[in-house]
Curated annotation (Swiss-Prot):
Organism in which the protein naturally occurs: Coccidioides immitis (strain RS)
UniProt-annotated binding residues for [4Fe-4S] cluster 1: 20, 61, 64, 67
MF (Gene Ontology): 4 iron, 4 sulfur cluster binding; iron-sulfur cluster binding; metal ion binding
InterPro entries, sorted: Cytosolic_Fe-S_CAF, Fe_hydrogenase, Fe_hydrogenase_lsu_C
Region (Disordered) location: 495-516, 530-560
Protein name in UniProt: Cytosolic Fe-S cluster assembly factor NAR1
GO biological process terms held by the UniProt record: iron-sulfur cluster assembly
């Protein structure tokens, strides 16, 4: 979610406790007395009865339809920089130098392979904080996670991360698959709907992006009517986890449970995404592949084991007393890089050149919409992309117009922020049909707008794709990004550590003004967009393999598309898993179990009694 909806700014951000609605399932306790007896209860007695604290599990929170923000409190406690440190201290690093040609060479015990993935928005936030370029920020993070002066310098086992992956690489895969998905949906637009029994049905138009977990959580809990429109593609974070775990499991002959994947993301809601049951090895596991089996594991293994944010990355460094600014802003030495076990995958994951596609026109959230439009524009020479701003800067309509006919070729839109998302879901809400036979279609209160128009999506039915993000301003404004006050404190501490002076405590006392916050976001955006000319790969571990093809310049769009589809086919063939199981996911309507007993019957009386005791009611 956005910084505006973070825990520090919302007074309805509740930790699991008596305020959570889950106690409705167990409270009030049934009296042991005879139910036929009458009892007079005074108000004083009711007020004195304190409800027991709720025992909320992560599954409860994700299956709850009461709120969105309280789930983050659970996830923050379960996925944090402390979990990273505890895991590194609990398990020694499994050195993969002894693995050759997919044969395990004496790896025993509880050792783990540690892999990290970093989003470009995190690098932009770090770069703006420390006054370095986006490329240097990437090197700083890599040195911290994998270098000799970073995490490996401390801890019980001196464990660090064997590989650090740029999620931009996997994002390119999602961009290409998004274009394919929209093309398939448009082809089905006038035909019969896909069978509901299909595991991954083609979404209805307009397709809504599904990479933002805050938006997905909101849709599943409150607007299930939009679920058929959601893109079935995994997000770059989720797809990176699947990609890493399936390939390393296959090539190194280790179960997914021994591969620990950390994702560093710009928002807290990515923790929600990593905790989804649909994003575990159970979704792609096949019965005839014992190599993927996780012995003695009762629970499915997550594709992403832990998610931390930009701010938590600073906390991770602080916990180990590591000054990030003192780390080398250069690639890792070759002596500290480990060859990836598959040369072809290594060439793809760690390219010598990579076009970041982080321009102003592509936006701050991955460029899904921009890639779709430019791909179709390349198929229609001389066509033009027209943009029209909506009610605010976070709503923009795009139309690709034919040069010959002047007619629209494809229409798309961008909706950022929950205020705009609410307007969007209202447009997609189907019209209420009368239960009376032969009744005429209802007419909207607004003159001239029929129910058929509302059912068609209120003006968005002819859109092919809509990029939806919960954060106003997009992903660079994620709630986990480094705030302007944190950046001031970090800069003060960094300066004092360099010149030896004592840090002052004045900076934290000054609350930033809205103008300062906007200026800070603009600075982060500027760094993010500058990465297009400052593109870099992580320290390539594939150089020592000697099998990679040299690429002197970035691939052209058509060649990039062919390269992506080729690597996807190679991935599926290598693992023996159908490609849809690897790249697609599913969404479901979250139904509240409030007021329902275990046998499914409603228990309205108990709910009403509890509501009265806590001062509420229906």
């Amino acid at each position: 979610m956005s910084a505006i909806l973070s825990a520090d700014d919302l007074n309805d951000f509740i930790s699991p406790g008596v305020a959570c609605i889950k106690p409705v399932e167990t409270l009030p306790a049934k009296s042991e007395r005879d139910e036929s007896a009458y009892e007079v209860t005074t108000e004083d007695k009711v007020a004195a009865e304190n409800p027991s604290p709720a025992q909320i599990s992560l599954t409860d929170c994700l299956a709850c339809s009461g709120c969105v923000t309280s789930a983050e409190a659970v996830l923050i406690s379960l996925q944090s920089h402390a979990e990273v440190l505890n895991t590194l201290d609990a398990y020694p690093e499994l050195r993969v130098d002894g693995f050759r040609n997919g044969v395990q060479n004496g790896a025993t015990g509880d050792a783990r392979i540690f892999v990290a993935s970093v989003s470009p928005q995190v690098r932009a936030s770090m770069a703006a904080t420390y006054g370095v370029s986006e490329k240097e920020a990437g090197y700083m993070i890599e040195q911290f996670l994998s270098g000799p002066q970073g995490l490996r310098a401390g801890g019980q086992h001196g464990s660090g991360f064997t590989w650090v992956v740029d999620t931009n690489v996997i994002r390119d895969v999602v961009l290409e698959l998004t274009t394919d998905e929209v093309t398939a949906s448009r082809a089905k637009f006038d035909s019969t709907a896909t069978s509901e029994s299909a595991e991954f049905p083609i979404p209805r138009q307009p397709i809504l992006s599904s990479a933002c977990p805050g938006w997905i959580c909101y849709a599943e809990k409150t607007h299930p009517h939009v679920l058929p429109h959601l893109s079935r593609l995994k997000s770059p974070q989720a797809l990176t986890g699947t990609f890493i775990k399936t390939i390393l499991s296959k090539r190194l002959n280790v179960p997914p449970s021994r591969i620990w994947h950390l994702a560093i993301m710009p928002c807290f809601d990515k923790k929600l995404e990593a905790s989804r049951q649909e994003l575990t090895d159970a979704s792609w596991q096949t019965t005839n592949h014992d190599i993927f089996a996780s012995p003695a594991m009762d629970q499915p293994i997550r594709d992403v084991d832990c998610v931390i944010t930009s701010r938590e990355l600073l906390m991770l460094a602080s916990s180990r007393n590591i000054s990030l600014l003192t780390l080398p802003l250069t690639p890792l030495p070759s002596s500290f890089t480990t060859p990836f076990p598959d040369p072809r995958i290594a060439q793809f994951l760690f390219p010598k050149h990579h076009a970041s596609n982080q321009s102003v026109s592509s936006g701050p959230s991955g460029g899904y919409l921009h890639h779709l439009l430019t791909t179709h524009q390349a198929l229609h020479p001389n066509s033009t992309i027209q943009a029209q701003r909506g009610r605010n800067a976070d709503v923009i309509d795009y139309t690709l117009v034919s040069a010959e006919t002047g007619r629209p070729i494809i229409k798309a839109a961008r909706y950022y922020g929950f205020r705009n998302i609410q307007n969007l879901v209202r447009k997609l809400k189907p019209a209420k049909t009368s239960r009376l036979p032969g009744a005429r279609a209802a007419v909207s209160r607004r003159t001239g707008i029929s129910a058929s128009h509302t059912a068609a999506g209120g003006g968005v039915s002819d859109y092919a794709y809509i990029e939806v993000m919960a954060c106003p301003g997009g992903c660079t404004n994620g709630g986990g990004q480094i705030r302007v006050e944190d950046a001031r404190d970090t800069a003060t501490i960094a300066t004092s550590s360099i010149d030896g002076s004592a840090p002052t405590a004045q900076t934290s006392q000054h609350k930033p003004t809205p103008q300062e916050q906007r200026a800070w976001l603009a600075r982060v955006d500027e760094v993010y967009y500058s990465a297009d000319s400052d593109s870099h790969p992580p320290s390539s571990p594939s150089t020592s393999l000697g099998d990679e093809m040299e690429i002197d310049r970035p691939l052209e769009p058509e060649s990039r598309s062919q390269s992506v589809h080729a690597i996807l086919q190679y991935w599926s063939d290598m693992t023996g898993i159908p490609l849809p199981k690897l790249v697609y996911t599913t969404f479901r309507k979250v139904e509240s179990d409030v007021g329902k007993s275990k046998n499914g019957a409603a228990d309205t009386a108990r709910v009403a009694e509890l509501a009265g005791k806590i001062g509420g009611g229906w």
